[in-house]
């Protein structure tokens, strides 16, 4: 055990004295320390922690500082590294080009636009707000409808509300295969206005409404495959819409923590956070491309992701870095699962209007979102049949 090295910025003298002698585990398990004083333990880099108030959380995000809130989800010892080696072997080349090409023709920009227009009509999707619960309920109904209309429910497909204490629930659509080896596609459903989260509007069109409707459309396209819908794929496929990413990956941590306890076999996780904004790249004279994260990700899965983009998308990819704890793939990595992440562009050219009232649909490209939907579909289909 390591003695906790850092104490909260405004911690009391009592807390400081306690922290000096307690191990990290004991400190984390002491509810009086962080609950009575409304402090949250955040991690800004592997093993670099700090106690902060909620207001300090938002101030850090305004400054562009990433973190993961580990107040409830304690140190598990599973931390991602820059050059992590895969323990899972992924296909060296695409095996189902004909099937994926046929399914991709059914993907619809119009569906994504209609869904995003409705999704951004909620005043905010802040995870502690009533409208955040309402938006999650609407999204749950859409996922349920997609699964029901495909007929997959007759073969065991389910849509689950994964409850959290803050109100807004996460959503898990599970399409069973012949084994419990599982491939996860994720996006976060919550939005936030960092200036006054509980009051100001947060349409969150790009962050991460775009990712939310992208993977929803990919789910609809994937379920057009009888083999997938009828449960004949080799592996199980899940689509996740996480609550409370903006609070520090709270929803995804809860899910992957439960998966670790249940000894779930998660063979791959792909997060897509912001899939619609390309004007920043175009203004910079950079070609439209999908941004692929190369830091704090599984290197083998990331190589497979590159191969998927090359095979199934009409645009290329550019490698980029977002630092530690930039989205929900961090939670999968934390619990020892191989994870990758894709976004709309290189990080320096991504949308700068996020977390404000101006994160609106009018700035987004549904053509680009369609490329992300193709990516999602190809990734899911190929790994659904991969011989893990």
UniProtKB/Swiss-Prot annotation:
Disulphide bridges, residue numbers: 322-326
Protein's cellular compartments: Secreted
Residues modified by glycosylation: 106, 180, 232
Any Gene Ontology biological process: proteolysis
Binding site for Zn(2+) 2: 207, 246, 355
InterPro entries: M28_fam (IPR045175), Peptidase_M28 (IPR007484)
The record's free-text note on cofactor binding: Binds 2 Zn(2+) ions per subunit.
Propeptide: 20-88
Predominant subcellular localization, coarse grouping: secreted
Assembly with partners or alone: Monomer.
Protein name: Leucine aminopeptidase 1
Species this chain originates from: Neosartorya fischeri (strain ATCC 1020 / DSM 3700 / CBS 544.65 / FGSC A1164 / JCM 1740 / NRRL 181 / WB 181)
């Amino acid at each position: 055990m390591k003695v906790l090295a850092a104490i909260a910025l405004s911690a009391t003298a009592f807390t400081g004295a306690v922290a000096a002698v307690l191990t990290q585990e004991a400190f984390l398990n002491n509810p009086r320390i962080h609950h009575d004083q409304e402090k949250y333990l955040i991690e800004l880099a592997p093993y670099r922690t700090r106690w902060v108030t909620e207001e300090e959380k938002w101030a850090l995000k305004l400054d562009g500082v990433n973190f993961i809130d580990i107040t409830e989800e304690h140190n598990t010892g599973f931390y991602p590294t820059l050059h992590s080696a895969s323990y899972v072997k992924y296909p060296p080349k695409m095996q189902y080009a004909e099937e994926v090409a046929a399914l991709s023709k059914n993907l619809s920009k119009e569906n994504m636009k209609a869904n995003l227009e409705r999704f951004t009509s909620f005043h905010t999707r802040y995870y502690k707000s009533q409208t955040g619960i309402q938006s999650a309920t609407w999204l749950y109904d859409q996922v349920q409808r997609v699964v029901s209309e495909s007929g997959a429910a007759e073969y065991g497909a389910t849509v689950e509300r994964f409850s959290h204490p803050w109100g807004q629930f996460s959503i898990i659509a599970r399409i069973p295969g012949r084994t419990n080896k599982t491939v996860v596609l994720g996006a976060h459903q919550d939005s936030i206005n960092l200036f006054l989260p509980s009051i100001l509007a947060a349409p969150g069109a790009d962050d991460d409404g775009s990712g939310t409707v992208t993977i929803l459309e990919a789910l609809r396209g994937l379920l057009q495959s009888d083999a997938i819908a009828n449960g004949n794929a080799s592996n199980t496929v899940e689509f996740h819409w996480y609550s409370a990413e903006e609070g520090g990956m709270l929803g995804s941590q809860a899910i992957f923590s439960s998966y670790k306890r249940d000894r779930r076999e998660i063979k791959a996780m792909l997060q897509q956070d912001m899939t619609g904004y390309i004007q920043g790249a175009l203004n910079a004279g950079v070609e439209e491309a999908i941004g692929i994260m190369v830091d704090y990700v599984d290197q083998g899965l990331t190589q497979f992701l590159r191969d998927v983009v090359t095979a199934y998308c009409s645009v290329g990819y550019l490698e980029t870095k977002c630092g530690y704890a930039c989205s929900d793939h961090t939670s999968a990595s934390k619990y020892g699962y191989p994870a990758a992440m894709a976004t709309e562009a290189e990080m320096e050219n991504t949308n700068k209007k996020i977390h404000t009232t101006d994160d609106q649909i009018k700035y987004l490209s549904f053509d680009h979102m369609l490329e992300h939907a193709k990516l999602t579909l190809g990734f899911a289909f190929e790994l659904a049949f991969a011989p893990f």
